[in-house]
A protein has these predicted regions:
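HIT superfamily nucleotide-processing domains
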Residues: 1-168
Length: 168
């Protein structure tokens, strides 16, 4: 795929769905690099709109919008997946710290696993209040090579995710 077109293709495809979460959960939308982890409860993949290597989203398969609506099996699995994903991101040097975000205002339950990178701190500061500005900046300034980096990060995270035999 041509570098210039990757950004437009991912953005256009993601924006063509009423519910991006449902599209990912049903396999109708293929996130950059494909999925990292899938089960009957959740999907772990790169964000299909924001080209930041290591920015992952856990999407529930059921169409609920709140952590409190999840079954025990789902939130236990989510905890394990967050732990493995965070370790993979850090082991690969994609971030030294991450921020987890889950908002109920979204139509579909998802959790952001957002990597903190030096350029983000320098340009925007750190913390949850900066994430929208960082995301907007990444989308507005995205190039095809940014999406290629996201796809490469997904391949590396997937390998690290399954390689790690982490004790819980």
């Amino acid at each position: 795929m041509e570098k210039e077109n990757m950004q437009q293709i991912y953005s256009d495809e993601a924006n063509s769905y009423d519910c991006i979460g449902c599209a990912i959960a049903k396999g109708e939308l293929t996130p950059p690099g494909g999925t990292i982890y899938e089960s009957r409860n959740i999907v772990l993949a790169a964000d299909p709109e924001v080209p930041i290597p290591g920015f992952l989203i856990i999407t529930g398969r059921r169409h609920v919008n709140s952590f409190s609506m999840l079954y025990k099996e789902e939130w236990m699995e989510i905890g394990e997946v967050i732990s493995k994903a965070e370790r993979a991101i850090k082991n690969l040097g994609l971030a030294q710290e991450i921020t987890l975000v889950q908002e109920e205002r979204s139509k579909h339950f998802h959790i952001w696993i957002f990597p903190t990178k030096d350029w983000m701190i320098e340009k925007f500061g750190r913390g949850v209040s900066c994430l929208r500005d960082i995301s907007r900046y990444a989308m507005e300034n995205a190039t095809g090579s940014d999406w290629e980096e996201v796809e490469e990060a997904v391949r590396e995270i997937r390998a690290e995710f399954y390689k790690g035999n982490y004790e819980y």
